[in-house]
């Protein structure tokens, strides 16, 4: 049976249960309960606390209404980061490579920020026209700003999906090349394996950065509207 490189992005079904449903529960199983006190859980709690402490700094620029979103956005960042990192493990499924999931996260949160801004109508419409715009350019700029407003959730979802998909494909391509070259040119295979190791480190960084960028952009959209 020949497998395609894109088969890794298809959600398999086990006993009638989509694997994406199981994969979405993995980050929650990593959260330690207070009754557990072994060394691994203590390190995990310390790591979670460090992330929460450092990532909440992006919310300092928000006004008081925006601070209500801090817990939601921080939890979203930890969820995305956990899914991205767990997806780098062998024989695992990465839910965040699915555009449907990313759009399902991006659209409701973006729409919530737009609804918050629509309460004071004059303030909301003011975002569509920069101050000091010449009169002949007003219709053009309103159209451009409206398009840029509605394209934001698409950019959020596509950016996360494209970066993770490209990284997974590149890792699989280089790993396949290293395996094929192992019996033909061992020296080249070793060099390819070194490149694969470095690329894996890069993808670990990308997995964390993309989760941070996703939430950072949402916080910037929120900052404009509160």
Swiss-Prot record:
Disulfide bonds: none
PANTHER family: ATP SYNTHASE SUBUNIT A
GO biological process, one term: proton transmembrane transport
Membrane-crossing segments per the record: 13-33, 69-89, 97-117, 138-158, 179-199, 201-221
Catalytic activity: H(+)(in) = H(+)(out)
Pfam families documented for this protein: ATP-synt_A (PF00119)
Similarity-based family: Belongs to the ATPase A chain family.
Annotated protein name in UniProt: ATP synthase F(0) complex subunit a
A GO term for molecular function: proton channel activity
Membrane-topology annotation of the record: Multi-pass membrane protein
Subcellular location per the Swiss-Prot or TrEMBL entry: Mitochondrion inner membrane
Domain of life: Eukaryota
The entry's keywords: ATP synthesis, CF(0), Hydrogen ion transport, Ion transport, Membrane, Mitochondrion, Mitochondrion inner membrane, Transmembrane, Transmembrane helix, Transport
Subunit structure: Component of the ATP synthase complex composed at least of ATP5F1A/subunit alpha, ATP5F1B/subunit beta, ATP5MC1/subunit c (homooctomer), MT-ATP6/subunit a, MT-ATP8/subunit 8, ATP5ME/subunit e, ATP5MF/subunit f, ATP5MG/subunit g, ATP5MK/subunit k, ATP5MJ/subunit j, ATP5F1C/subunit gamma, ATP5F1D/subunit delta, ATP5F1E/subunit epsilon, ATP5PF/subunit F6, ATP5PB/subunit b, ATP5PD/subunit d, ATP5PO/subunit OSCP.
First-listed, main subcellular location of the protein, grouped into a coarse class: mitochondrion
GO cellular component: mitochondrial inner membrane; proton-transporting ATP synthase complex
Function recorded in the entry: Subunit a, of the mitochondrial membrane ATP synthase complex (F(1)F(0) ATP synthase or Complex V) that produces ATP from ADP in the presence of a proton gradient across the membrane which is generated by electron transport complexes of the respiratory chain. ATP synthase complex consist of a soluble F(1) head domain - the catalytic core - and a membrane F(1) domain - the membrane proton channel. These two domains are linked by a central stalk rotating inside the F(1) region and a stationary peripheral stalk.
């Amino acid at each position: 049976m020949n497998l395609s490189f894109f088969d890794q992005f298809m959600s398999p079904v086990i006993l009638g249960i989509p694997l994406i449903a199981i994969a979405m529960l993995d980050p929650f199983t990593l959260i330690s309960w207070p009754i557990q006190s072994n060394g691994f859980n203590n390190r995990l709690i310390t790591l979670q606390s460090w992330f929460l402490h450092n990532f909440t700094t992006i919310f300092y620029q928000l006004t008081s209404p925006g601070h209500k979103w801090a817990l939601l956005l921080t939890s979203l960042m930890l969820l995305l980061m956990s899914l991205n990192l767990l997806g780098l493990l062998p024989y695992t499924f990465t839910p965040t490579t699915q555009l449907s999931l990313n759009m399902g996260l991006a659209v409701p949160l973006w729409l919530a920020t737009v609804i918050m801004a629509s309460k004071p109508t004059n303030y909301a419409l003011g975002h569509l026209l920069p101050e000091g715009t010449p009169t002949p350019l007003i219709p053009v700029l309103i159209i451009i700003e409206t398009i840029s407003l509605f394209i934001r959730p698409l950019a959020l979802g596509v950016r996360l999906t494209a970066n993770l998909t490209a990284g997974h494909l590149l890792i699989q391509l280089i790993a396949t090349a290293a395996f094929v070259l192992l019996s033909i040119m061992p020296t080249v295979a070793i060099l390819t394996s070194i490149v694969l190791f470095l690329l894996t480190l890069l993808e670990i960084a990308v997995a964390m950065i993309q989760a941070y960028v996703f939430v950072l952009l949402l916080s910037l959209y929120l900052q404009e509207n509160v």
